[in-house]
Amino acid sequence: MTADVNNLIWIDLEMTGLEPDVDRIIEIATLVTDQELNIIGQGPVIAIHQSDDVLAAMDDWNQKHHGESGLIDRVRASQETEAQAVAKTIAFLEQYVPKGASPMCGNSIGQDRRFLNRYMRELEDYFHYRNVDVSTIKELVKRWSPETMAGFKKQNTHQALQDIQESIAELQYYRSKVFKI
């Protein structure tokens, strides 16, 4: 596969909480689409090992959701470090998109970028500084065309790969219903 500057990198992180100064990344997944939002590559889905102390410090919401999804058990069993996850993810991305070409794509991607900046700077640097944040479009559609919102329902599994797949599907929906292109 030849790397293409028009391809888009989609990323999702699962974290122990919302504060990068305190919380940690526990899962990362990436997908690459072409410019028409067709998935052309799936990167590694990596549970990142964190200590029992880090996991025990999670609030009730994170304990519940990451426990029910099996992610906490996967994190405990994982031997993967943040540095290893970065190296594997970049090795995947290099096949599809040159460094600095793709905006960071996903839902509420500003939060992911904050954690990448703190714990995975080399990966954060792989992206263009711009974002394609599907949640921005969702917020506008909710205000400008609320009836359109009923046509797309997310599963909200809080599992990184499924969340990215839903983000892409959501943008495809908005493209066809709102942008009509």
From Swiss-Prot:
NCBIfam families: PRK05359.1. It is an enzyme of class 3 (hydrolase). Keywords: Cytoplasm, Exonuclease, Hydrolase, Nuclease. Residues 8-171 form the Exonuclease domain. The lineage of its organism: Bacteria, Pseudomonadati, Pseudomonadota, Gammaproteobacteria, Alteromonadales. One of its GO terms (cellular component) is cytoplasm. SMART domains: EXOIII (SM00479). The active site is at residue 129. Disulfide bonds: none annotated. GO terms for biological process: DNA metabolic process. PANTHER family: OLIGORIBONUCLEASE, MITOCHONDRIAL. InterPro entries: Exonuclease_RNaseT/DNA_pol3 (IPR013520), Oligoribonuclease (IPR022894), RNaseH-like_sf (IPR012337), RNaseH_sf (IPR036397). Its main location: cytoplasm. This is Oligoribonuclease.
